[in-house]
């Protein structure tokens, strides 16, 4: 058990990299906040107001889809979900995006996932929340907020699984970037998130028509003037209060970035700003550097069952970093910041603050 826990903590050293406090980027006047991180380590590469708490709109669904994929563990075949009264009628009067789910409808899990992702279906998000929330939407929202805490995020609170704006429903660009980074580790999520082709949902027990879901992000459509080839997957969001929000995974020459923008006043502002940010980041960060182990060690107390189970020794295993051009491994220092104690519940319940990188 001790060896397992030590290995678990050591793995987190590679995955949970804290931000570089000095990461600044282009000053945008048309978008309130943004954050760009390295998708592999979580290192912040550029930001503006990244911790400001804002209304997320439908990029909320990244967490919803991530938790649904976590529960499914890639096993979608034969799994059907039954649409409840609340899934449909809790959205009455909200002018929500939806896929016309009906109470009592039996929906394949895969259809619910793609409908929520591509069509941004709020009824689909409700259905998924019930799936991973013990049968209720409220349980799903509680699971979403529990995952926020597990990731160590401090500027996010969810009040629903779809993103309809409310005073107690908010996130930040930094938090959303880390949520997407986590979601990309869940079985099947990246496949859903990056799908570009039209998705076909077959008729069900109560819905006789075939439904078609098409990609709406113009930055991913090759015939659009706003097309950005590097963007592999994205989620768009909009409400009158939130304005335009956006989160994407972009890849170029082996470098994988996550970019989040929030509160862009106009749709064209979002398009132009995302292009500016990705051009900046890909020009400045062109490759990874392997930083060898510094020989750092630390002890963590393991507790459980009302007492102390022992201690494990954690060793710095080295880390792979995305450094700006002109910055070398010699310019980086690494320090271990381990928790005082560890309760062995699950991988995702460790706070994401085990390694801090300082650029000097």
How should these model regions be labeled?
Residues 2-3, 61:
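A general lysine-centric signal
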Residues 4-22:
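Sec-dependent N-terminal signal peptides of Gram-positive bacterial secreted proteins and lipoproteins
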Residues 9, 45, 65-68, 244, ...:
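Active-site-proximal flexible loops/turns
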Residues 14-15, 73, 277, 285:
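Hydrophobic alpha-helical membrane context
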Residues 15, 120-123, 284-288:
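Short secondary-structure junctions and interdomain/linker hinges
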Residues 21-174, 178-187:
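Active-site-adjacent loops and short helices of periplasmic peptidoglycan-processing enzymes
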Residues 153-154, 167-170, 174-360:
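Domain-terminus/edge residues, biased toward the C-terminal soluble/receptor-binding domains
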């Amino acid at each position: 058990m001790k060896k397992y826990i030590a290995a678990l903590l050591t793995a987190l050293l590679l995955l949970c990299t804290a931000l570089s406090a000095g990461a600044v980027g282009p000053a945008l006047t048309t978008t309130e906040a943004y954050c760009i991180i390295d998708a592999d380590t979580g290192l912040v590469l550029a930001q503006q107001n990244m911790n400001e708490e804002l209304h997320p709109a439908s990029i909320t669904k990244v967490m919803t889809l991530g938790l649904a994929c976590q529960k499914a563990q890639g096993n979608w075949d034969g799994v059907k979900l039954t649409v409840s009264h609340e899934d449909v009628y809790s959205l009455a009067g909200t002018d929500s995006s939806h896929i016309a789910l009906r109470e009592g409808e039996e929906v394949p899990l895969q259809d619910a996932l793609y409908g929520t992702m591509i069509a941004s279906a709020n009824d689909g998000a409700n259905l998924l929340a019930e799936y991973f929330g013990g049968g209720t939407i409220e349980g799903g929202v509680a699971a979403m907020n529990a995952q926020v805490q597990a990731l160590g995020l401090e500027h996010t609170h969810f009040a629903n699984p779809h993103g309809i704006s409310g005073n107690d429903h908010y996130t930040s660009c930094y938090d959303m970037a880390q949520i997407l980074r986590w979601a990309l580790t869940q079985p099947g999520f990246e496949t859903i998130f990056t799908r570009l082709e039209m998705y076909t949902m077959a008729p069900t027990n109560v819905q006789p028509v075939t439904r078609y879901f098409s990609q709406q992000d113009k930055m991913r459509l090759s015939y659009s003037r706003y097309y950005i080839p590097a963007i592999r997957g994205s989620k768009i969001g909009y409400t009158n209060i939130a304005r335009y929000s956006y989160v994407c995974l972009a890849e170029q020459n082996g470098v994988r970035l996550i970019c989040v923008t929030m509160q862009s006043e106009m749709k064209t502002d979002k398009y132009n700003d995302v292009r500016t940010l990705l051009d900046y980041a890909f020009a400045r960060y062109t490759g990874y550097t392997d930083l060898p182990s510094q020989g750092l060690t630390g002890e963590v107390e393991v507790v459980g069952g009302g007492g102390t189970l022992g201690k494990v020794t954690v060793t710095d295993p080295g880390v792979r970093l995305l450094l700006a051009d002109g910055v070398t491994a010699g310019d980086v220092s690494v320090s271990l910041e381990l928790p005082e104690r560890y309760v062995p519940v699950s991988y995702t319940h460790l706070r994401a603050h085990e390694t801090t990188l300082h650029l000097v």
